[in-house]
Amino acid sequence: QLKQQNIMIAKSKAIREARLKESINIIARAMQSGECNHSEGVIRLTMLLMPFGKTLTPYPSMAQLHEIVHNMPTHDARKQLEKKERMRLDLARERAEAKFEHEIKEELRQFLDDIKQIGVI
């Protein structure tokens, strides 16, 4: 009974890890192709890397962009802001994305290579 439970737990963990790795790959590729803006991408990647005990620290531009945008309100919290404040935050986010765009594209190549070579960085 216990052995079967442990097998099921291990299978579930492997399935979850595979799903997380696939999501990491999809988001990084979407960032590379422009389907996902870099701000949203770094926020999502940060969350997906956490279960593996990893961060974006090896990728300084992605890490810096995350540091700038991760506390910006989203969804309902964003809707509650006055239009002027929303515009100010949008401008700050867009400025940061533009500042790091070239470096992030370079880092994404390395990030995707790292994921391939060792599963998850």
Residues of each region from the PLM?
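Acidic, Ser/Pro/Thr-rich low-complexity regulatory regions
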Residues: 1-121
